[in-house]
Structure formats: structure tokens, C-alpha cells
């Protein structure tokens, strides 16, 4: 099945990216899809539920998570890529390693989702540049504690002297400049403000989502990844919902998905595809009539 990546990149409606964590320790679903057969079945189920893209990650980025070996990450990713590419899936690979990115692209993956935005392994942008038809998600990133795959800061990286929106915008644009210098084409780039990464609170994350149109104005498509993050649960708790469970967080994520679709996000990255699929459909319709 031929994939029109230009159409994926330049979509006029918000896409749904389903999360496939083939990890032992992801915060919400660690261990559930580690078995290759279960990973394939879950990926296929998300496609059937309406996911436009499947985002495969073999290393947890939760706070405090320990890194998996390069060999283990490669093995997990390759198994999932080979299993799903034959089903016509558009595959995004959540990795910070150049070796994993190269292997996945050579086996048919189309998107590299680098939560470090090219900072953890400086070769990743070069690998993307070598694959001119691929896309590269550049996420805002302030650094991790050595030896950890999660956003555990060396110092207090959650302080934004000029306000979270201005600082994240400026820092993310600097990351984009560095990626361009590495040879990545502007047409390959998607940006992500990195919700939850060095942004622990409601006060950090909601202003970034409210400022979505400012990020859209860069001309780069924008990915929003709010699904099941702690600030979503905190917002529910602030509204008087005690100890919100996963279903509550998925409902809240769907509300965020609808709002982000209405305001022109390129895609939303979610765990519960079905709920956000319906929410995004309403947001897309709202946007279409608002712009009519």
C-alpha cells in the first residue's frame, strides 16, 4: 500500500496517532504489549478504531525510567514494524537513537518521533535527512538526568523565566534551527511543545495548548501529546474529581483532542484511539465550518 506522506504531513484535518508502547514500564500501559503477538494485535485494533498513525515506542519516557539497551530497543521496534507495515500502517517510531531510527526507516517506517528533538543523539537528524520522504517530530526538550530515559532534571528545568509559552517557543525554534542545519528539510519537520516534559503542572501545560495557534503560525505542523499525562489528572482533581481513573483521563484527553483539532493541531497522540477519534471528528467539523 503506497502512503502519500505529503498528504499526511499537510493534512487539512487533525489526525489521530495511536500509542503502541512495547515497554515494560511505561506509566499507563507498561508490559501490556511487550509480547510481539499482543503488540501486533493492539496496533491492528487501533488502526481499525481509526488511528491514522501508529507510534511505536520501545523505551519508556516516564520520569525516572531506566534506559533499555540499544539491542533490546532495536529488536522490539523491528518486530512491531515488520508486523504492522504489511497491514498498510503509517508508522511513527518514538526513539532518541540514530541506530533505531535508521533501522526502522529502512524497514518501512515513515516518521521518527524524537522526544529529545535531536539533542540526545545528534545523529538522529542526519539519519532523517538521509531519508528525504520521512517526517521528523521535533519535541521541546530541556535534558534528562544521565542514565534515565525520563524527564528527571539535572537541575530545576521546570522554571521558565520569561513564561512557559515564550520560553518553550524560543527553545523549540532553536532546536528546529539545529535540525535544519543537520540537513533535515523544512518539509519534513513537525513540532511538538512537549507537554509534561519539564512541565509538571496544569499551569505549565494548559497555556501551551491555549497557545497552539502561535505554534501553528510557524508553518510547521504541530503534534499534541497530552494523553494520560499527570497534568490531565491534576486538572480533573482541581475540578473536584477525586482520584480520577484511566477512563476519566481518557475522557479528559478526548476533550483536549477535540479542542486541539478545532484549533488546527496536525495530530493528537493518544492511548484510547476510539474516544479521541470521535472527539477529533467533532473538532475537525467545527474548524471546517468556522473557516467556511
Regions found by a protein language model. Name each.
Residues 185-188:
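Short acidic capping loops at alpha-helix termini that bridge into adjacent secondary structure
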Residues 3-5, 10-11, 27-41, 61-79, ...:
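Active-site-adjacent loop and "lid" segments of alpha/beta metabolic enzymes
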Residues 41-57, 263:
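Catalytic domains of carbohydrate-active enzymes, especially glycoside hydrolases
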Amino acid at each position: 500500500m503506497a502512503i502519500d506522506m505529503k498528504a499526511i504531513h499537510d493534512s487539512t484535518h487533525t489526525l489521530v496517532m495511536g500509542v503502541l508502547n512495547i515497554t515494560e514500564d511505561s506509566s499507563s500501559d507498561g508490559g501490556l504489549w511487550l509480547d510481539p503477538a499482543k503488540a501486533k494485535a493492539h496496533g491492528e485494533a487501533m488502526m481499525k478504531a481509526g488511528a491514522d498513525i501508529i507510534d511505536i515506542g520501545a523505551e519508556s519516557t516516564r520520569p525516572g525510567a531506566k534506559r533499555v539497551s540499544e539491542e533490546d530497543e532495536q529488536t522490539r521496534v523491528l518486530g512491531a514494524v515488520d508486523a504492522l507495515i504489511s497491514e498498510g500502517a503509517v508508522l511513527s517510531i518514538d526513539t532518541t537513537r540514530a541506530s533505531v531510527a535508521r533501522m526502522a526507516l529502512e524497514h518501512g517506517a515513515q516518521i521518527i518521533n524524537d522526544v529529545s528533538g535531536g539533542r540526545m543523539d545528534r545523529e538522529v537528524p542526519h539519519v532523517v535527512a538521509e531519508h528525504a520522504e520521512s517526517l521528523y517530530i521535533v519535541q521541546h526538550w530541556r535534558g534528562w538526568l544521565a542514565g534515565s530515559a525520563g524527564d528527571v532534571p539535572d537541575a530545576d528545568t521546570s522554571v521558565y523565566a520569561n513564561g512557559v509559552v515564550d520560553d518553550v517557543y524560543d527553545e523549540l525554534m532553536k532546536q528546529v534551527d539545529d535540525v535544519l542545519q543537520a540537513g533535515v528539510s523544512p518539509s519534513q519537520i513537525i513540532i511538538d511543545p512537549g507537554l509534561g516534559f519539564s512541565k509538571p503542572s496544569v499551569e505549565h501545560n494548559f497555556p501551551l495548548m491555549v497557545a497552539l495557534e502561535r505554534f501553528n503560525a510557524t508553518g510547521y505542523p504541530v503534534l499534541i501529546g497530552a494523553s494520560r499525562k499527570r497534568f490531565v489528572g491534576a486538572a480533573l482533581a482541581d475540578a473536584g474529581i477525586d482520584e480520577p481513573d484511566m477512563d476519566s483521563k481518557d475522557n479528559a484527553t478526548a476533550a483536549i483532542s477535540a479542542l486541539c483539532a478545532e484549533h488546527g493541531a496536525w495530530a493528537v497522540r493518544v492511548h484510547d484511539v476510539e474516544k479521541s477519534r470521535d472527539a477529533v471528528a467533532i473538532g475537525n467539523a467545527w474548524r471546517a465550518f468556522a473557516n467556511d
